Amino acid sequence: MTSPYATLAYNPIRDNDKLPVLVRLASPSDASLVYSTWLRSYADQNKDQHRGILYKSHRKIIRNLMEKSVTVMAVMDDDPNQIFAWMCGLRVESGPLLVHYCYVKDAFRRLGLANLLLKYFEHRQGEPIICSHKGYVYKSLRDRYNLFYVPQVREPLGVDKFRDGKWKL
């Protein structure tokens, strides 16, 4: 936005070429944010499903996946309560990286935050990523990030089957 009268006030997030970001493990106090953003964004991307039923049934799926996985938060480095993005996933020993869901706030999209969160899981370029959920951006990222959509991972024992080596790519 340009103004003939004055320049916009300096905004360190917008005006820096690098976000002041810290990656930390999610804490119990982050759970409500993760649940609400996961459910809302997933429901928004699946408008053909009844919203009430999706919320009720998917809450159990999210709880199971979060209990068996790791959730990491991308936060402002000097204020760990200012959350930019989060990712729930699991690095399977001698197996693929499982990513259940990644959420980036609108204002911070296309700034490399999802890549930063993938680095927490020691993702290597070209390595396959198993996705238990698929959203709008899946198709555009599928080839570049070697994504494989496997919704069966959402089953109660789905994560365990990858962890135990019963399911492989």
Residue ranges of each PLM-predicted region?
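Conserved acetyl-CoA-binding loop-helix of GNAT-fold acetyltransferases
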Residues: V104-R124
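Short, solvent-exposed loop/turn segments that connect beta-strands within catalytic domains
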Residues: N16-D17, D78-Q82, G95
